[in-house]
Structure formats: structure tokens, C-alpha cells
């Protein structure tokens, strides 16, 4: 219900974002990608498109700062995290929550420690979480790495999973409010 109200209130803003995306580059307004949701069920996440449309490369599903495919509008949307607002559609559809561990692509879920996997996938993924706040500058960190994917798997992902476990093991309304507050403070 809250996501429907949010979508309704944000509809004019969504229209402006969509118009800016379409005016800058051809292609769809939304970027869709398979992610792993609650109980390991795959779903296709919504995000506002921030990159030029290119054929799937089969390469690494990571984007680093300075990637030439990122459009000017896309750079703004990424920096402000406005590209994530489209995930309110996923919340409305019931595949995501406002707060919860961020959903990963299957390629990285395969790196979850087996003893944690069931717990980590026992809740609906969220638009934001403690790891989103901590790694707000993830693209910049990955751009500095010699091997961005290795850096993600060996350094960033384990820390994100620790944050996710903390959230899963302490699911309180107060924690949700704290995450939302921290997220808003990093965006504004």
C-alpha cells in the first residue's frame, strides 16, 4: 500500500526522469536484470536506465565509475540514487521490500557461504539496507581495483553479507527506520 502511494506521489517525478532518459539516448526507460529474491526465486528488477543500450556482453555484471556506457543523465541518477526509485514497482509487485538485503545477480549468490545462504534468502530483498549506505561509493571503489570483480567477490561482498545477516537476525521496525534515515541522509 505504501509503495502504491509512493508511486502515485512520485509519478510526475518518474515522468521527468523517463523524459530525460528518452531525450538523451534511445532505448527503454527501465533497465531490467535478473536478481535472486526471497527463497532463491529469480525475478527481474526494475531500475531507471542509466547506460546506453548495448547488446548483452556476457561479461561481468558490475559497473565501475567512469564507464563510458553511462549517460550524462545516468551519471546524475546513479550519483543521487534516483535510478533505484523504479524498484518501488518491485515493492508493489511483492518481490521486494523498502528495506532488506539488496538482491544480487545469480552469479554472485553462488558465492554466498552455504551455511548462510538460506538465512540470507529468507527475507524479501530491499531497495536499501545498511550495506547500501556503507557502499554508496561502490562504483568508485571498484574503479580503483586492479580486478573489479575479484575485489567485489573477495572484499565487498563478504562485508555486504555480514550487514545482511545482521539485518536478517534483527528484523525490527526500528532498524528499518534507521536504514531509511541513513539512506535519506546520504542522498540529500
Predicted regions and their residues:
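A hydrophobic, helix-centered structural microdomain
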Residues: 1-55, 90, 167-188
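Positions in alpha-helical segments
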Residues: 3, 31, 71-75, 107, ...
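Short amphipathic alpha-helical surface micro-motifs
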Residues: 11-14, 25-30, 79, 103-104, ...
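Short charge-dense sequence patches
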Residues: 20-26, 36-39, 83-85, 126-136
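A short, structured surface patch at a secondary-structure boundary
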Residues: 63-130, 178-180
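C-terminal terminal-structure detector
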Residues: 121-188
Amino acid at each position: 500500500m505504501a509503495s502504491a502511494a509512493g508511486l502515485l506521489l512520485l509519478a510526475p517525478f518518474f515522468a521527468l526522469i523517463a523524459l530525460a532518459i528518452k531525450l538523451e539516448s534511445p532505448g527503454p526507460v527501465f533497465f531490467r536484470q535478473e536478481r535472486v529474491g526471497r527463497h532463491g526465486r529469480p525475478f527481474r528488477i526494475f531500475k531507471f536506465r542509466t547506460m546506453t543500450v548495448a547488446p548483452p556482453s556476457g561479461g561481468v555484471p558490475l559497473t565501475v565509475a567512469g564507464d563510458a556506457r553511462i549517460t550524462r543523465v545516468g551519471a546524475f541518477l546513479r550519483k543521487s540514487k534516483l535510478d533505484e526509485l523504479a524498484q518501488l514497482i518491485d515493492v508493489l509487485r511483492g518481490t521486494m521490500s523498502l528495506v532488506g538485503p539488496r538482491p544480487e545477480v545469480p552469479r554472485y549468490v553462488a558465492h554466498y557461504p552455504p551455511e548462510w545462504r538460506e538465512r540470507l534468502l529468507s527475507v524479501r530483498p530491499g531497495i536499501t539496507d545498511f550495506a547500501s549506505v556503507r557502499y554508496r561509493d561502490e562504483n568508485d571503489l571498484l574503479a580503483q581495483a586492479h580486478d573489479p570483480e575479484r575485489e567485489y567477490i573477495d572484499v565487498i561482498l563478504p562485508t555486504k553479507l555480514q550487514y545482511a545477516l545482521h539485518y536478517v537476525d534483527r528484523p525490527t521496525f526500528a532498524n528499518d527506520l534507521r536504514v531509511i534515515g541513513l539512506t535519506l541522509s546520504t542522498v540529500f
